[in-house]
Curated annotation (Swiss-Prot):
SUPFAM superfamilies: YebC-like. Belongs to the TACO1 family. YeeN subfamily. Signal peptide: none annotated. The keyword Isomerase does not apply. It is found in: Cytoplasm. It holds the Pfam family TACO1_YebC_N. GO terms for biological process: regulation of DNA-templated transcription. The keyword Cytoplasm applies. It comes from Streptococcus sanguinis (strain SK36). GO terms for molecular function: DNA binding. This is Probable transcriptional regulatory protein SSA_0586.
């Protein structure tokens, strides 16, 4: 599993580096986190968490700073979180998280993306029950047992710790992700490849041929929507 996360991170980072839409999405997320609390990340853990993720995606510093400065201003722009669930070809499923200033626009766009690209949007809860909400942390290392013990000593609710090909992957209860990051930093680990709240599928499907092509198009259209923040799926490799 550690290799899977590393591969996904490498794939996304390569795309993110040339994708200004990703920067814009993080800009919105940073703005919202800063607006909800203190614009200083040292006293706003939610903001610091988003900034750390943005840095992992190679978002430039000026994008981060601009979003924080915007939150410090007098703008009244508001954003609403949303979640949509749906189905793609041959047993594939998707959960789409959004952050938008226009809920009606976003709902229509997501529904159209499913309908025009071989998918079907489902009702709330139609997919999510087949996924588990977990915190995921990935960093360089090979001693899973030691990391597990450190996190238990820090009273972190740990689901699992895996070591594979020089990477450690930690799975935590979603409420303990930040606590786990703090504990790992205090133990001397400063560089993380992944620090995310994830919806992890209880089982995966592997798509090939036309099914894979159809799914890739559906995924791409959703990902390109400016209001879509994250997509979770049960398709292997995504």
């Amino acid at each position: 599993m550690g290799r899977k996360w590393a591969n996904i991170v490498a794939k996304k980072t390569a795309k993110d580096g040339a994708n200004s839409k990703v920067y814009a999405k993080f800009g919105v997320e940073i703005y919202v986190a800063a607006k909800k609390g203190d614009p200083d990340p040292e006293s706003n853990t939610a903001l610091k968490f988003v900034i750390d993720r943005a840095k992992q995606a190679q978002v430039p510093k000026h994008v981060i700073d601009k979003a924080i400065d915007k939150a410090k201003g007098n703008t009244d722009e508001t954003f609403t979180e949303g979640r949509y669930e749906g189905f793609g070809p041959n047993g594939s499923m998707l959960i789409v998280d959004t952050l938008t200033s226009n809920v009606n626009r976003t709902a229509a766009n997501v529904r159209a993306a499913f309908g025009k690209n071989g998918g079907n949007m489902g009702a709330s809860g139609s997919v999510a029950y087949l996924f588990d909400n977990k915190g995921v942390i990935v960093f360089a290392g090979d001693d899973a047992d030691s990391v597990f013990e450190q996190l238990l000593e820090a009273d972190v609710d740990v689901d699992d710790v895996e070591a594979e090909e020089g990477s450690i992957t930690v799975y935590t209860a979603p409420t303990d992700l930040h606590k786990a990051i703090v504990a790992l930093r205090e133990s001397g680990i400063q560089e993380f490849q992944v620090t995310e709240l994830e919806m992890i599928p209880q089982s995966e499907v592997e798509l090939t041929g036309e099914d894979l092509e159809t799914f890739e198009k559906l995924y791409s259209v959703l990902e390109d929507d400016e209001d879509v923040q994250k997509i979770y799926t049960n398709v292997d490799g995504f």
